């Protein structure tokens, strides 16, 4: 953990809603004049889309039905740890991009589902911002979680997470319900072993809880609206958190535990702005002092 070269990491499963959290931080950075370098977790997958299909078919032929993007064998955990370590020490490192779509791939003259070449991080950034699956991962070989100054978990209750993944993969990526369901089942062991443990290492967790029936996520026709849910916000260390201020600023919020505040789903972005803007400002103040 470095004061001069701070790191913020957003970690969550596929369909958890990490992208919306990233947009909130982008707004904070823009408003406060913070120059960030963004790292997408997908860029640390070991295989591109075509390679992954081949490797998955090979795994299935050998009886491995749980070959997934969530586990260690299909990700460059060592490279991710090296990036975090290098940035924390000197503000440098190497990154690449994963090109999800034709629109993303066109400027690079590549096919969707491929990686760009590795390149150095831009110089003179104020912080590194990571969004992906493994911002807090720890294994016998690596400890990524030790580097972020602020580690945030985004983890809806499981049925809501599945509804969001089903909706996204069907509407935006053209998959069938059966294909998405197979993916969820295949990933389950790695979800339990690699994704869930990270949320015990985070500094703050955001868990959206629907107030409507999501008993069978595989037949749900739409994602519950923000106003049809509540968000549970848990702080690992509540010291210094002004809960009275948050309660006064966020209508219908309440404390459920000494380190937990619950807010209406439609107020999640406001809550993030109120909670994380002071965090970012303190980071920048410490960064200035560390540079003296």
Curated annotation (Swiss-Prot):
Keyword annotations: ATP-binding, Calvin cycle, Kinase, Nucleotide-binding, Plasmid, Transferase
Enzyme class: transferase
One Pfam family hit: PRK
Signal peptide (UniProt feature, chain positions): none
Top-level taxon of the source organism: Bacteria
Binding site for ATP: 12-20
Gene Ontology biological process terms from the UniProt entry: reductive pentose-phosphate cycle
Reaction(s) catalysed (UniProt annotation): D-ribulose 5-phosphate + ATP = D-ribulose 1,5-bisphosphate + ADP + H(+)
Pathway annotation: Carbohydrate biosynthesis; Calvin cycle
Keyword ATP-binding: yes
Enzyme Commission numbers on file: 2.7.1.19
InterPro entries, A to Z: P-loop_NTPase, PRK, PRK/URK
GO molecular function, one term: ATP binding
Family note: Belongs to the phosphoribulokinase family.
Subunit: Homooctamer.
Record protein name field: Phosphoribulokinase, plasmid
Source organism of the structure: Cupriavidus necator (strain ATCC 17699 / DSM 428 / KCTC 22496 / NCIMB 10442 / H16 / Stanier 337) (Ralstonia eutropha)
């Amino acid at each position: 953990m470095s004061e001069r070269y701070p790191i913020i990491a957003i970690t969550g499963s596929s369909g958890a809603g990490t992208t919306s959290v990233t947009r909130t931080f982008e707004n904070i950075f823009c408003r406060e004049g913070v120059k960030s370098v963004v790292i997408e977790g997908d860029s640390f997958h070991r295989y591109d889309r075509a390679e992954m299909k081949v490797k998955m078919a090979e795994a299935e032929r050998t009886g491995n039905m749980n070959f997934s993007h969530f586990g260690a064998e299909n990700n460059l955990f060592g490279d991710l740890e090296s990036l975090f370590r290098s940035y924390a020490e000197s503000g440098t490192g190497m990154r690449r991009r994963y090109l999800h779509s034709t629109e993303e791939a066109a400027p690079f003259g590549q096919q969707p589902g491929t990686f760009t070449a590795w390149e150095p991080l831009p110089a003179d950034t104020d912080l590194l911002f990571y969004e992906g699956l493994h911002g807090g991962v720890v294994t016998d070989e690596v400890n990524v979680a030790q580097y972020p100054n602020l580690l945030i978990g985004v983890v809806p209750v499981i049925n809501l997470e599945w509804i969001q993944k089903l909706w996204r993969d069907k509407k935006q990526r053209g998959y069938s319900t059966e294909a998405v369901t197979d993916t969820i089942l295949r990933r389950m062991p790695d979800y339990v072993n690699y994704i869930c443990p990270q949320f015990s290492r985070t500094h703050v967790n955001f868990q959206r809880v629907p107030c409507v029936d999501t008993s069978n996520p595989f037949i749900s026709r739409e994602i519950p609206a923000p106003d049809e849910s509540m968000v549970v916000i848990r702080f690992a260390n509540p010291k210094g958190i002004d809960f009275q201020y948050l309660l006064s600023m966020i209508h219908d919020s309440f404390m459920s535990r000494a380190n937990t505040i619950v807010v209406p789903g439609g107020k999640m972005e406001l809550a993030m702005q109120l909670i994380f803007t002071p965090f970012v400002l303190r980071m920048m103040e410490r960064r200035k002092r560390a540079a003296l």
